Design a protein with these regions (language model features):
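Long, low-complexity C-terminal extensions of enzymes
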Residues: 344, 348-446
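Short beta-strand to alpha-helix junction loop
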Residues: 139-159, 201, 271-279
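Predominantly flavin-linked oxidoreductase catalytic cores and closely associated redox partners
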Residues: 168-295
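FAD/FMN-dependent oxidoreductases across multiple families
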Residues: 174, 245-247, 271-349
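Low-acidity, Ser/Thr- and Arg-rich intrinsically disordered low-complexity segments
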Residues: 2-16, 24-25
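N-terminal Rossmann-like FAD-binding beta1-loop-alpha1 element of flavoenzymes
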Residues: 62-92
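N-terminal FAD cofactor-binding segment of flavoenzymes
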Residues: 79, 88-133
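Cysteine-centered motifs
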Residues: 9-10, 37-39, 53-56
């Protein structure tokens, strides 16, 4: 794999370019390639110093271009690297950030091995659900709940790609992607690149239509805490603790214990607007001091985040040669925000088709429309009467086997199981939301 670190811009060309070369950062473990400056080749001075530019224009042809090197872009790159039938494909990965910080974590459940099991920070075999009047700790049978730290993931995939000469990484931002007759043109901060196919995982740009669609957030603040006494069960995820006040919204505590004296404790909401940070912190403090009855603890880390939850259509592609990935392709599940496993399934689906046929699959995401309807109904309920969300999840966990609930949330249930799930919850909130969906406009709080 090759790495280039590029910026802008040359006086003697109208094409994208970069400043005179003074210093470049080489990431250990990667080959570094310095392309020849075209100003030098033409005999042009190129800049006031008389020196050639580091790069005045780069145009490289690739089979696949990945716009973005976060979870979605790196996942697709990794799946390509593991497919022997795609070894002859040249792949360009464009990412503006160094990705050398632990900027997030991903949690997910799975009933089998994953390509990233070696970097799983912790896994759990029990899952707890709590609400007023119902509490249960479920023993997981075929599933395991897992967590991966972002920095571990970035390092793992980049190390794998560094050993593979078919990959090139350029630290640059993608400004525009354009379909052309031969494939795709990518205009970037490093110049122009072309490829046969592009995979775009940049954040989506939504033209919001609140009169037609529902726009909520899963927003949270989390504290990683250490205690002086054993208080957490390292085998049990506190998946949802709804025992706190709901305040006409869906509000719960989520806990990932790493040991008896260390855990990540998050206060999470499903609603339209974030809170002042002090309100999240007050809720976490109340949980630690009143629910867990802790008198002393240390906050050693913090997580803050907001994940869009919407039924706004997120197209799987932008023309014949540009495929969307990650949140841009709707891989964050609208009603829960979980994305990591959906990203892996999407990557595997695309790579399998490319390896087998040389072409993209006809159904780019392989999504099933009934689950989109279920998500839309739940989002409508959250928007109209957010506090009812607690009752719906309570009925789901109280009246169904845990494996069925997790399979349903993972969109892997059959039609008979979908019927059993829907039959287990009070119908009236859903019937009212069905009416709103049929009328084509979101419901409002009555």
């Amino acid at each position: 794999m090759t790495i280039s670190t590029l910026s802008t811009c040359c006086r003697q060309t109208s094409r994208p370019a970069v400043v005179p070369y003074t210093k470049s950062r080489v990431i250990p473990g990667f080959f570094y390639v310095q392309p020849v400056c075209r100003c030098v080749l033409r005999g042009s001075r190129g800049n006031k110093s008389g020196a050639g530019c580091f790069i005045c224009f780069v145009k490289s042809d690739y089979d696949y271009l990945l716009a973005g090197g976060g979870a979605a872009g790196l996942s697709l790159a990794y799946h390509i690297s593991q497919e022997p039938r795609l070894r002859d494909k040249r792949v360009l990965l464009l990412e503006p950030a160094a990705k050398d910080q632990n900027d997030r974590t991903w949690s997910f459940w799975t009933d089998g091995p994953t390509p990233f099991d070696s970097i799983v920070a912790h896994d759990w075999q029990q899952l707890a659900f709590r609400s007023p009047g119902f509490e249960r700790v479920f023993q997981l049978q075929r599933y395991r709940y897992k967590m991966i730290r972002g920095l571990d993931f970035y390092r793992f995939v980049r190390t794998e790609l560094a050993q593979n000469p078919q990959f090139t990484l350029v630290q640059a931002s993608v400004e525009t992607l354009r379909n052309v007759a031969t494939g795709v043109e990518a205009h970037t901060s490093a110049g122009l690149y072309t490829a046969r196919l592009a995979f775009d995982s940049r954040p989506p740009e939504l033209d919001r239509q609140p009169e037609k669609y529902r726009y909520l957030l899963q927003h949270f603040v989390g504290w990683e805490v250490e205690t002086e006494q054993d208080v957490f069960d390292p085998a049990t995820v506190e998946f949802m603790d709804f025992r706190g006040e709901q305040q006409q919204e869906a509000r719960f505590i989520y806990v990932l214990p790493f040991g008896p004296r260390q855990a990540l404790v998050e206060y999470t909401l499903f609603s339209e607007m974030p809170l002042p940070k002090a309100e999240y912190e007050a809720a976490i403090r109340h949980y630690l001091e009143h629910t867990l009855q802790l008198t002393t603890y240390r906050v050693v880390g913090e997580e803050v985040g907001a994940i869009p939850m919407t039924d706004h259509p997120l197209p799987a592609s932008a023309g014949p040669h540009i495929v969307h990935l990650g949140t841009r392709a709707g891989r964050a599940k609208p009603s829960t925000g979980y994305a990591f496993q959906r990203i892996q399934q999407h990557s595997a689906h695309l790579v399998q088709a490319l390896a087998s046929t040389g072409h993209l699959p006809k159904n780019l995401t392989n999504d099933q429309p009934q689950f989109h309807l279920f998500d839309t109904l739940l989002l409508d309920i959250m928007r109209r009467r957010g506090e009812v969300t607690r009752d719906i999840f309570t009925e789901l966990f109280q009246r169904n086997p845990i494996e069925r609930v997790l399979a349903f949330l993972d969109e892997r249930t059959s039609w008979p199981d979908n019927f059993r799930i829907m039959n287990s919850v009070t119908p009236w909130p859903f019937l009212r939301s069905i009416a709103h969906v049929l009328r084509g406009r979101p419901g409002k709080r009555s």
